[in-house]
Structure formats: structure tokens, C-alpha cells
Amino acid sequence: MEVLKQENITFADGLDRVVFRCDGKGLAVAEDGTLQMADEPDVFIKEYWGEGSYTFKSVRTGKYLGARLSESQGEKPKMGQIAADREEAFDWFVMEIFHVEPQEDGSVVLTNRFHYPVYKDAEGFFSFEQTEGIPITMEVVENGIEKAVAAVRGKKQVLLALGCNSVINAKEEIDRNTLELPEEQEMLLDRIAEVNPNTVLVLFTNYPYTLQKAMEKLPAIIMSATGSQDMGSAMAEAVLGIYAPAGRLNMTWYESIDQLPDIDDYDIIKGKRTYRYFDGKVLYPFGYGLTYTTFAYENYKVSLKDDRLLQISLDVRNTGDTASDEVVQIYGSALESCVKKPICQLLDFVRVKNIAPVSYTHLTLPTT
């Protein structure tokens, strides 16, 4: 990113740093990766993903705490032993997830992703059965939000990156209970927008959020799904205008979870689910997406062939000053039907690549 070399860039991740103590001792990562008692506690980066899911990353080793699933072999941790030996929280069963249960005396009990409490024995800390958890003191030694606020104060431009971990809280065998951002991300957004409203929200997510606060307080939002091998660089190039983003939403983004029926109701017609049957106001509709230019559709022509094939032709003109893709989407509605039909339904779409400013592309789409 040569364009950034002359810029004064400040970074803050907005995450708290914490230490753990138990029975008068600190908790630290041993040479074999296991969590053990120590005179001096290790500092951990606390990441909150919402719905009670936390991860803790050792500042010293750069690895995440987790409860191991496999039996010990050699120096590997035993079944359920708490250890920091993974550089990322990414697996089918993400054992780096912990839940934090506050106790009346101010301590906490940590539980693993299956809600088994963390307990201690002579070999270390474990979590693989229902038993009484050991009280642990979790002390915040650095407030991540306050550090981020100090970093953005007075800056010309701020990029605020929020979003999800693609395998925590929402995937096969896990359903979300909310459409909101994690509480700590909401708090960070509020504080950053208050201190420096010239902030662009960079959102990495595989599913919809309710973003009313961001829409009200920030001038722009740019979003990408996760999963690409060079995701950060691609997003940076889009933000810097090296290329123009031109994605489209593959899901409806609702204003509120109250607009959705019960999660076990699979009748999309009765429940008015998806863009095809939902008749309320949405945050962003299915197929929505902007880019760094604008387009006009001209010279429409529609003809019917063989009583079943619609042939649609049109010109797509770039009316702005930046080259970009456009995604032409054709929707249809059944005005008369003896059975319930969608309000509208996507019939066809085509991505037109890299239309230059002022130029146009002619399209013909056969649609059944």
C-alpha cells in the first residue's frame, strides 16, 4: 500500500486487556502451552463476540486459550485441559469460546463453549464435565475502548472495523438470538462516532445486523463477507479507491428481529420471510449495493418469444466519473394468480464488468 506510506496512521483494536488470578496467584501460559498458576499473571486480549461468547488471546504468546478436545499425546494437553496453543479461533467446534459467569463476590466462573465450568486440579485447569467451577478474578488492566477513543481524537479520518467471527455464534448447529452488533462493538461505535464523526464503518460479516446507529451517526458503511484469503488487503484497496466495490446483498437486512417469525416456523409464505414475501420496511433489501459511481438504465425493450420466454434488452450507462461493475437485476411479479405468489422474485441477473465513465454497455437477457 504505497499510498499509505506518507500518512500518519494510528491503530487501536478497541479490546480490553485482562489478567486472571486464582487462590492468590496469577494465571499464565506455561512453556507447554497449558494454563498454570504463576507469581506474575499473563495479560490476555479479551474479545467479546456477543451472546455471551468470549475469546482470550495471550499477549505474550499470541495464542488463544481453549479447552482441548483430544487426549494427550506427548506434550499435547490432556482432554479438556485449558491451554493456549492455537493462533486463531477457527474450527468446526471452536473450543476457544468461553462464557463468563459473574459471581456475587465479584469473581467469575469461566465455562467452555459447551458451558462446562473451568476447574483446577494438580495438573492445571480443565473444562470437560459438569462440576463446580473455580472462582477466578478477571481484572481489566487496559480499557480498550478508552484507548481507541484517545487514538481517534482529532484525526482527519477514522476507519472503524466491526463484525463477526464466521464460526462463532452463527453457523451450522448454531443460531443467533439477535440481529444487533455485540454490545461492546455498539459501545465502541457510539464512543468513536461521538469523538470523531468523520468515521467510516468497515463491516466484516456473513449475516445481517441492525445498523440504525451507524446509519444515523456515520457518513458511510462498507461491508464485506469473510472468507477470502487476502480479505484485509482487498478491503483496504476498496476503501482507498484503488478499485470500486460492487457487491450486492444476498439476504434481506431487517430493521428489527421483531419483523421475523419464530425461528422454528419454516413456512416462508405464512411467516412473510425473505424479500419474496416480506411486506414491511427493511434496513437494506435483498440485492442492495452501492459503488463509487452511478448508473442509468436506458432504451428498455421487452419482447415475448414462444409464449414463455421474455427477452429484455437495455443499455447500462455509467453516469459518474469512476469505472465500476454494475449488477443488473430483473425481478418479476404475478399480478393475477389463484395461489399465493411472491411479491416479487429475482428472475435473472448479470454482472457487467468495469464500465468506464460516460460509456455504456448493451445487454440482452433471455428470462423464463
Give the ranges of each region predicted by the language model:
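Lectin-like carbohydrate-binding module/patch detector with strong preference for beta-trefoil
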Residues: 2-155, 160, 172, 180
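Conserved small/polar residues in nucleotide/adenosyl-binding loops
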Residues: 361-367
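Active-site His/acidic residue clusters
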Residues: 164-187
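Short proline/glycine- and polar residue-rich coil/turn motifs
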Residues: 351-360
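Redox-cofactor binding/interface segments in oxidoreductases and associated redox assembly factors
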Residues: 160-161, 223
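Loop/turn elements at helix/coil->beta-strand transitions in domains of secreted/extracellular proteins
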Residues: 154-158, 196-200, 217-219
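Short beta-strand and strand-turn-strand segments in soluble, beta-rich domains
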Residues: 337-351
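Secreted, periplasmic, or luminal enzymes acting at the cell surface/secretory milieu
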Residues: 1-13, 204-325, 329-333, 341
